């Protein structure tokens, strides 16, 4: 009987919490106080500009002001979290401003929509930010009624400086700045930083993004939620409280089934009674399995709250489509690939596909272990020993150029270790380091070398490879993920009889790859490696090691890199990246999804929000 009482109490508490989340909080965020019109009218009529007294109703007041304003960007909280009426609005053209705030009908063709972009590091200037700002430009271009809210933790930078950086870094200009509202998140920014969580990092960051999303909604609740950075914890409160459409641009899944392969117990069925000497380690392993399983299924649930999922490439799409499966058959749900905008319209301008280039292997990457510079050095050394032993002319031997940046002390240490390895392998005359150079210098390098390297295993996309091909550099890539599936692909579907090269580039694998399977090798001494085919697990594909690939290109079969063939490959590569990775292609596709979100927003208002915005 006592158990029933406990269960009843728990059920009542859970029901009460659900009612608060689904009923009370939406009114807090979306419905202003009953006398809101009088308050705003009073401030408009005041001769001096004063702050509105809105208490904890900041979101609802800011929403109405933003949606009615001729200059929505004025209502940023950069200076402080207080709200005042913009002078352009307080001029109050015969009550037009107040009247505009009352327009709440779902089917009103003039009704404006706030697209909220949740991207805490909006000012960082990386690949994720390029996606963000190209998406912002496309959203604004879709309709004059669209307003964009940027939720950012970069509170040290004012809106103007952020937009100036966007133009300088990504060449994204002509943004309608008046329709971009910056919402600065100051309280909980640290909670999404992986370094903040010394233990249980994944669940900590999920919790942190949930809390940060609450701060975002409390300052300004949007009509559509767009996550362009990969913080799925934000979806929970957005879905439960605001009941609005959610779109997620996924750069990579935060947890994948393959990660369980690292665990001692990969499923409950593998757990056994431990030996006395193994009790401690087994208990820890079981705990780790439970933790990872909990995170995995929570992530799976969060994916069910998303209406439109866009993956940055085939590798991400294949993984996320196998994880976010709960709502696959739901009406209106969509999952697709949308390659990131790489600015190939600009990159391919004046590219030289004719003429000779320097016989160098350029590797552009940050100095981090996962980029596998060390693998390149070891394989290059092996190739060099073979090339010199058979008397290959020095002019036919390519040299290495490592070009990259050091953003952290760890990067600097990696660079130091690589230089030491060059000494140990006696490669000083063959390897050049270019550190922290300018973008202009990078363009010079891309315009003068023949070949570009990429050695990372399962790089989700690989924008560096796109840059190689855009500037006529022939890619030599690790055969995995983005470079294999999306970027270095056969132009114009020209048939090929081998797996390790096509009409745009070359591929290699390595025995150190996590997916290398010794049992598949017919000759363990061979430098041509067998890997399970990505299309048919019962068949295999053959790839050379990097050392063997260099042997093939520069010693055994130099016709593969004759000047005539290289010219053709450059032309194919330029056409390929223009067709798939231009800003224009991204923009057109994003605009389609912006329209879909607008349609979903209407149906959500009618079916899920019960007319709450019409209160007062």
UniProtKB/Swiss-Prot annotation:
It catalyses: an alpha-D-Man-(1->3)-[alpha-D-Man-(1->6)]-beta-D-Man-(1->4)-beta-D-GlcNAc-(1->4)-alpha-D-GlcNAc-diphospho-di-trans,poly-cis-dolichol + 2 GDP-alpha-D-mannose = an alpha-D-Man-(1->2)-alpha-D-Man-(1->2)-alpha-D-Man-(1->3)-[alpha-D-Man-(1->6)]-beta-D-Man-(1->4)-beta-D-GlcNAc-(1->4)-alpha-D-GlcNAc-diphospho-di-trans,poly-cis-dolichol + 2 GDP + 2 H(+). It is found in: Endoplasmic reticulum membrane. Pathway: Protein modification; protein glycosylation. Pfam families: ALG11_N (PF15924), Glycos_transf_1 (PF00534). Its EC number is 2.4.1.131. PANTHER family: GDP-MAN:MAN(3)GLCNAC(2)-PP-DOL ALPHA-1,2-MANNOSYLTRANSFERASE. This is GDP-Man:Man(3)GlcNAc(2)-PP-Dol alpha-1,2-mannosyltransferase. The gene is ALG11.
